[in-house]
């Protein structure tokens, strides 16, 4: 059922793209494009097109310097973000640590730069490192020649509902294991 639905959706998408391209082709042919290729006219990739910066020699400024140097916001030369930064170290919440431990990542200390002075934790840089101990652990029952092991570890069957709807990543179970009750 799902396979047939996906096939119908893909065919409908292909028909829509073909119809769109034929309409665009008919429009450009009826208007009378000077270029030989209607696709070139559609993409605008013509050699006579004038593009700022790109039709200039290297190092040559464009004609209208003001259009490229004006900024829509005021810039103060006396205030620099680098002079007002005060690095502060913060610690992560236990739930965040549990989530990171469940995926095998250990965070380095978080350094937050308080740029404006009124917002805590702005521009925090977190660097994650994978630990060697977080390698995949094979269940001892899965190593045996057990016929039912394939249904318990790795494969999903509609007859058994022992897995969560998240599939391979059983998030609530991993959080319960990684975050002990405090």
From Swiss-Prot:
Lineage: Viruses, Varidnaviria, Bamfordvirae, Nucleocytoviricota, Megaviricetes
Domain of life of the source: Viruses
Annotated signal sequence range: 1-26
Residue ranges of the region described as Disordered: 68-90
Biased composition annotated in UniProt, kind: Low complexity: 74-90
Presence of keyword Signal: yes
Pfam families: DUF5852
Source species of the chain: Frog virus 3 (isolate Goorha)
The protein's name in its UniProt record: Uncharacterized protein 040R
Keyword vocabulary terms for this entry: Signal
């Amino acid at each position: 059922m799902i396979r047939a639905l996906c096939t119908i959706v893909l065919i409908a998408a292909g028909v829509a793209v073909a119809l769109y391209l034929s309409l665009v082709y008919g429009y450009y042919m009826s208007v009378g494009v000077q270029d030989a290729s209607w696709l070139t006219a559609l993409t605008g990739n013509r050699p006579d097109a004038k593009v700022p910066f790109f039709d200039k020699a290297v190092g040559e400024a464009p004609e209208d310097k003001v259009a490229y140097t004006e900024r829509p916001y005021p810039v103060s030369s006396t205030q620099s973000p680098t002079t007002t930064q005060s690095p502060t170290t913060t610690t992560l919440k236990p739930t965040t640590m549990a989530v990171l431990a469940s995926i095998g990542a250990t965070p380095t200390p978080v350094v937050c730069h308080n740029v404006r002075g009124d917002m805590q934790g702005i521009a925090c840089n977190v660097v994650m490192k994978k630990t060697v101990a977080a390698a995949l652990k094979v269940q001892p029952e899965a190593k045996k020649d057990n016929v039912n092991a394939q249904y318990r570890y790795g494969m999903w069957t509609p007859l058994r509902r022992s897995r969560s709807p998240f599939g391979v990543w059983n998030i609530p179970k991993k959080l319960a294991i990684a975050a002990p009750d405090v």
